[in-house]
Amino acid sequence: MSVKNGLVQLENLTSMEKLSVDEVMGLIKRASAFKAGTAEFDLEKQTFASNLFFENSTRTHHSFHIAERKLGLDVLEFDAQASSISKGETLYDTVLTLDALGVDICVIRSGVEHYYEELVNSDNIHCAIVNGGDGSGQHPSQCLLDLMTIYEEFGKFEGLKIAISGDLTHSRVAKSNMMMLQKLGARLYFTGPAAWYSEEFDDYGHYANLDRILPELDVHMLLRVQHERHDSGESFSKEGYHNHFGLTEERAKMLKPTAIIMHPAPVNRGVEIADSLVESPQSRIVQQMSNGVYTRMAILEAILAGKKAK
């Protein structure tokens, strides 16, 4: 990984831990250039990408597809049910096969944490691996689009007060964001049910009472309650969660006029956030979705630059 002539070069993108501040800022600025229509990109040869999603996805899956098409890549959509995965083939052997067929980039989402380690450490797999989310582990492309959205608003990260609220333990978005936001100089707070907070977060910020810190925040980043990752009986009722931990209309009145509301989506309206606030003037949720395309264009460009530099 490196930055040369203003362009980031990546071999793979699996975790935010692997990225430097310079690389992150380079990707944000490149994504902004794609958004503004000022970025020049020339695909020098036919390039194939395949999107392997073993968990349901709307935003990540389709924004990667659109990003790939905007850059001129040939996209091989992958249906696990129609593939040899349904016959018992492993993810490793599936990627080994796609690599042998000539696929250059595999974007993968899996419920298995760290699935990518076996792939990137293989001597026989040469395609680039982009992690589209691994269980409760990491979600680097979501983190980067979140950072782009924050940077568009404030032009900095240093000194910003940011709360990440909700289902912390089960959230790969929280883990990716806390790592990089701390590195970029933001001051982090965590709020939500104490049962969904763990000691690993102590290295990055402070567990706080939401009502006490709301007036100080620059960014309130909400997280979806991930019922599919919970043990039975672990979840709250929708109304109970919203009243105790969600961004209600009354709580939103406590925010500074300059503060912004974020959510990686899908949004459970009336649970993490009041329905009326999802598209409110302070919300940047739709902007996050839009920025996902440009951020993923920047990621793919960096991967292609890394492959060319080898």
UniProtKB/Swiss-Prot annotation:
One of its GO terms (biological process) is 'de novo' UMP biosynthetic process. Carbamoyl phosphate binds at R59, T60, R109, H139, Q142, A265, P266. It catalyses: carbamoyl phosphate + L-aspartate = N-carbamoyl-L-aspartate + phosphate + H(+). Pathway: Pyrimidine metabolism; UMP biosynthesis via de novo pathway; (S)-dihydroorotate from bicarbonate: step 2/3. Its EC number is 2.1.3.2. InterPro entries: Asp/Orn_carbamoyltranf_P-bd (IPR006132), Asp/Orn_carbamoylTrfase (IPR006130), Asp/Orn_carbamoylTrfase_sf (IPR036901), Asp_carbamoyltransf (IPR002082), Asp_carbamoyltransf_Asp/Orn-bd (IPR006131). Keywords: Pyrimidine biosynthesis, Transferase. It is an enzyme of class 2 (transferase). GO terms for cellular component: cytosol. Signal peptide: none annotated. One of its GO terms (molecular function) is aspartate carbamoyltransferase activity. SUPFAM superfamilies: Aspartate/ornithine carbamoyltransferase. Disulfide bonds: none annotated. The keyword Transferase applies. NCBIfam families: asp_carb_tr, PRK00856.1. PANTHER family: ASPARTATE CARBAMOYLTRANSFERASE (PTHR45753:SF6), ORNITHINE CARBAMOYLTRANSFERASE, MITOCHONDRIAL (PTHR45753). Heterododecamer (2C3:3R2) of six catalytic PyrB chains organized as two trimers (C3), and six regulatory PyrI chains organized as three dimers (R2). Catalyzes the condensation of carbamoyl phosphate and aspartate to form carbamoyl aspartate and inorganic phosphate, the committed step in the de novo pyrimidine nucleotide biosynthesis pathway. Belongs to the aspartate/ornithine carbamoyltransferase superfamily. ATCase family. This is Aspartate carbamoyltransferase catalytic subunit. It comes from Lactococcus lactis subsp. lactis (strain IL1403). The lineage of its organism: Bacteria, Bacillati, Bacillota, Bacilli, Lactobacillales. The gene is pyrB.
